């Protein structure tokens, strides 16, 4: 949120820029009405319209960016690390806002993040990637309860849980070895250099996603 907004533009001009580019209004009055409506959707007050980006907190700046993204009435939005730079309390507010906007506007999200608690909270289905390849796809609850791919298992084992009993029951999986360079990918499965289940087949051929039931897909030869 700190580098995505032009410091020389007011909030009104930032949110209104997509309207200008795509000519989505017929008068200045209609333009302003649309901007104020977008601001209201993301929880910004009308008096914020004439202020500049540096006058806002990180969470408010993110709301400005989201309002701008909504200006063209999209049906699909890609959210790339949309809350990673925010404090935890602000993250929760922004995520709740995403869900409210989805209910109101029927928007679909592709939510890219490294925080699995956030991902599980907001997602219907989750795809886990390793070095640019999808290694597992499942419904959010299914993936959280029954991960199959060794990489997914290691990721979930590192997630902190507030329940001490649950945290004690979940065994921490420590991966060994170094992450391969994306410029010099290993043959076969990219994860094999860190996987305790790796075999000769893993070095020869990259596994494809196979359905394990209920839409749960995994790319692994040995799991």
Regions found by a protein language model. Name each.
Residues 7-21:
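Q-loop/switch helix immediately C-terminal to the Walker
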Residues 33, 50-52, 170:
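Interfacial catalytic loop of ABC nucleotide-binding domains
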Residues 52-56, 60:
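Conserved ABC ATPase signature
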Residues 71-75:
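A short, proline-enriched helix->beta-strand linker immediately N-terminal to the Walker B motif
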Residues 82, 86, 90-168:
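P-loop NTP-binding/switch modules centered on Walker-like glycine-rich loops
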Residues 139-223:
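Charged, flexible cofactor/metal-binding loops and thiol motifs
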């Amino acid at each position: 949120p700190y580098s995505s907004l032009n410091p020389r533009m007011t909030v009104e001009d930032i949110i209104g820029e997509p309207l200008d580019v795509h000519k989505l209004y017929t008068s200045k009055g209609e333009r302003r009405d649309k901007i104020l409506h977008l601001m209201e959707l993301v929880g910004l007050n009308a008096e914020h319209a004439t202020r500049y980006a540096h006058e806002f907190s990180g969470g408010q700046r993110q709301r400005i960016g989201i309002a701008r993204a909504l200006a063209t009435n999209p049906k699909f939005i890609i959210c790339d690390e949309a809350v990673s730079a925010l404090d935890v309390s602000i993250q929760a507010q922004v995520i709740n806002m995403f869900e409210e906007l989805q209910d109101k506007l029927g928007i679909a999200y592709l939510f890219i993040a490294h925080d699995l608690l956030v991902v599980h909270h907001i997602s219907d289905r989750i795809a886990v990637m390793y070095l640019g390849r999808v290694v597992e796809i499942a419904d959010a609850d299914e993936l959280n309860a029954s991960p199959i791919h060794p990489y997914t298992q290691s990721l979930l084992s590192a997630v902190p849980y507030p329940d001490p009993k649950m945290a004690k029951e979940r065994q921490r999986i420590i991966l060994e070895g170094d992450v391969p360079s994306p410029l010099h990918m290993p043959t076969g499965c990219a994860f094999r250099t860190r996987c305790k289940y790796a075999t000769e087949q893993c070095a020869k051929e990259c596994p494809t996603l196979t359905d394990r039931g209920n839409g749960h897909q995994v790319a692994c030869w040995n799991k």
